[in-house]
Amino acid sequence: MLDREGFRPNVGIILLNARNEVFWGKRLREHSWQFPQGGIKYGETPMQAMYRELHEETGLHPEHVKIIGRTRDWLRYEVPDKFIKREVRGHYRGQKQIWFLLRMVGRDCDICLRATDHPEFDAWRWNEYWVPLDAVIEFKRDVYQLALTELSRFLRRPAQRAEKPRGPRVSRYPRVIGAQAQTLTIVDTSVVCSEIEVEASTLDEMPPHVIVGK
């Protein structure tokens, strides 16, 4: 379903945790990372499409999230010809998106990348809201920046946690991605939803939080 200008109606999702960190999914068998997104089917409202895509790509249900904002209007990006199927070239130009900002009220272990038979992601992680977008495919970066900027007005300051005495750090394991080693600090491995703190400053540097099948 395309509009008169050749853009497909679509929804994008920026999912936050309690610390205002953002969910990123690694595209299946690729090295690029992105937010959940998907087309709006005929007869669907943007909100209905958002909840469907949220479940298909992250396994989350409406009760796991709270809507805290959305973009006022459509945001558009054009897709380069090399990514467009030959039979629709000349008709299809790209996507026009309504973006939703969600707050996750469930737990990390509620996320399931295999909620459907056709998963979009094979890994996921939390990262800072304003992380550099180098690992996002190039033609989507501008619209990501626009969505993040417009929706940032809905952000609230994360709850302050009481300072705990700093003891020696334990259970550190090197992880190598490409030629670069990363360090994970396992905070609590005794619960199903274990928390992992990762020392990294950019999206590309961060190792996956969860890998499908492991």
From Swiss-Prot:
Its cofactor is a divalent metal cation. Keywords: Hydrolase. It is an enzyme of class 3 (hydrolase). Transmembrane segments: none annotated. SUPFAM superfamilies: Nudix. Belongs to the Nudix hydrolase family. RppH subfamily. This is RNA pyrophosphohydrolase. It comes from Burkholderia cenocepacia (strain HI2424). The lineage of its organism: Bacteria, Pseudomonadati, Pseudomonadota, Betaproteobacteria, Burkholderiales.
